[in-house]
Amino acid sequence: MINEIKKDAQERMEKSVEALKNGLSKIRTGRAHPSLLTGISVDYYGAPTPLNQVANVIAEDARTLAITVFDRELTQKVEKAILMSDLGLNPMSAGTIIRVPLPPLTEERRRDLVKIVRGEAEGGRVAVRNIRRDANNDLKALLKDKEISEDDERRAQEEIQKLTDAAVKKIDDVLAAKEKELMEV
């Protein structure tokens, strides 16, 4: 009983940390990275299709992404999709290869991005605390139904608190790394 609650809480906390990492990877830093364009969909014969299924995206250098479109007719649609995204990027086409230069981030934009990143991290911490609360409520329900003793409940709550502290520390580490990456010029 108790082990199931702890295992469930741990899995959910790890998923929260992973979700935060994925969310932060989409926030643009000064460096070019193919994952910047993962959220972009292209209209492919009437169906929205992820960019990585119709083109190959690579980092050409620190400030340029190169996109090789598989189907020549899609080149303009890919360009349009990148322009329409809210990433503020200006693609330049050369045959089937589209180059996307990344403008350098201004100090003000970096600070805004750090605020956004901190907000995302706080959302992750709140999610982890909610998972802790749910697990503790499950333990209290077991105690109320006299399925576990008070000592077992207290011990389990302490272990869940340790899991929570570990997850929050992971979130803080991810946040610190992303802030450092954003503030590098």
Curated annotation (Swiss-Prot):
GO terms for molecular function: ribosomal large subunit binding. Belongs to the RRF family. This is Ribosome-recycling factor. Responsible for the release of ribosomes from messenger RNA at the termination of protein biosynthesis. May increase the efficiency of translation by recycling ribosomes from one round of translation to another. The keyword Metal-binding does not apply. Keywords: Cytoplasm, Protein biosynthesis. GO terms for cellular component: cytoplasm; cytosol. It comes from the Bacteria. It is found in: Cytoplasm. The keyword Phosphoprotein does not apply. It comes from Vibrio cholerae serotype O1 (strain ATCC 39315 / El Tor Inaba N16961). Its main location: cytoplasm. One of its GO terms (biological process) is cytoplasmic translational termination. SUPFAM superfamilies: Ribosome recycling factor, RRF (SSF55194).
